[in-house]
Amino acid sequence: MNIVLFEQEEVVHGCAVLSFRDSRFCHIKRVLKLSAGACFKAGIINGVKGSARISLATEKYLVAVFEKLEYEDCALFPLHLVIGFPRPIQLRRILRDVSSLGISSIHLVGTELGERSYLDSGLAHMEKMHTYLIRGLEQAGGTKLPLITVSESVRTFCSQHTHILGDSTHQKLILDTKNTLTDLGSAALRGDVLWIAIGSERGWTESERLLFSAMGFRAVDMGRRTLRTETAACAACAVVLANAHAWKRKIPRPGKRSSPISRKNP
């Protein structure tokens, strides 16, 4: 945990109270070993970040006073993932890890070859998924949560996002092992926004491939090795962000002109 995050409603008049049952209390007291008067990195989810000072600390609770707070000076990367709904243990890892990478959104879709019971699992509820997204932010030291949606099928997802996916300035790629013309690392990336679709354990069916193709998705691969969904998701994000030189520059906050998430041609 590299930043302690709070929901906006937890902060009243610049102060927040944590009880001994709260994992954040345990981290501050037992891991950081801080006491009254000490400061720690803190932030408000989807809001400001900076530091907080412990004004009072007992064995039962502590009071933190926020100070030196400012808005993050960069936005999330304009990268969006569409993922075939994976097993719960995989989903936890994906939500945590891609959230820490700073992507804009995660869209979970039921697939024809996927296990339908995954969609009915407790982890499919937004509150549960929210928890793992926050863990990724705590690791990365950020405050901005990616958007997350759940769709029953690829067809449903496409119909719900036609107005977005139909935008010609959005580049769309689907990771696949069939009908690919190039690999992800060699794909010429262009445009301000990039979508990447990644299948669940058993991949995509032909009808799902046709749906994505109709929405303008191009098939690419990541070599001959068969990867787990969580591995493919993190690797794909890393390849795209590295090729876009995303880690060498700041993404402007909303309202400012954004640079394309594209690879610079020699």
Curated annotation (Swiss-Prot):
Keywords: Cytoplasm, Methyltransferase, rRNA processing, S-adenosyl-L-methionine, Transferase
Keyword Transferase recorded: yes
GO molecular function: rRNA (uridine-N3-)-methyltransferase activity
Any one annotated GO CC term: cytoplasm
InterPro entries recorded: Alpha/beta_knot_MTases (IPR029028), RsmE (IPR006700), RsmE_MTase_dom (IPR046886), RsmE_PUA-like (IPR046887), tRNA_m1G_MTases_N (IPR029026)
UniProt xrefs under Gene3D superfamilies: 3.40.1280.10
Catalytic activity: uridine(1498) in 16S rRNA + S-adenosyl-L-methionine = N(3)-methyluridine(1498) in 16S rRNA + S-adenosyl-L-homocysteine + H(+)
GO terms classed as biological process: rRNA base methylation
Location in or out of the cell: Cytoplasm
Enzyme's top EC category: transferase
Pfam (any one): PUA_4
Family matches, as CDD domains: RsmE-like (cd18084)
EC nos: 2.1.1.193
Keyword Cytoplasm: yes
Function: Specifically methylates the N3 position of the uracil ring of uridine 1498 (m3U1498) in 16S rRNA. Acts on the fully assembled 30S ribosomal subunit.
Family: Belongs to the RNA methyltransferase RsmE family.
NCBIfam families linked: PRK11713.5-2 (NF008699), RsmE family RNA methyltransferase (TIGR00046)
Name of the protein: Ribosomal RNA small subunit methyltransferase E
Designated gene of the protein: rsmE
